Amino acid sequence: MSSTAPSPVVVAASPSDQSHSLHNVFVYGSLLADDVVRVLLKRIPQSSSAVLHGYQRFSVRGRVYPAILPVENNRVTGKVLFGITKPELDIFDIFEDVEYERSVVEVSLADGSEKLSALTYVWSNNRDPDLLYGDWNFEMPF
């Protein structure tokens, strides 16, 4: 992780803007591992530790990756990947598959220096019986 956060990247607002824009992506699970990101993107983007307020991370029964859902008075720690291109975002969409929906969220950099808009992947089924309470542990699956 970089010790100083790069300038925030503006997230594209409309589909016509997205082909040439760069994106911030908040990650909180398997994409925290640089090795996973490197395999997918063929590079490791600049990143900064961040917090997503108003969400909770869940373990998913039988899976090595977590899910997040909106839950008041909770927070998810992770990191923001900066400068993600549209083709790279498409790769993340395929990797995350249909179990997740890409959403725009506001995250706070962990050092408290600023808030910024980012994309993240939210579990699509908030009534999924396989969601387990208790935070997912990044170290356990790997």
Regions found by a protein language model. Name each.
Residues M1-F142:
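Glycine-aromatic micro-motifs
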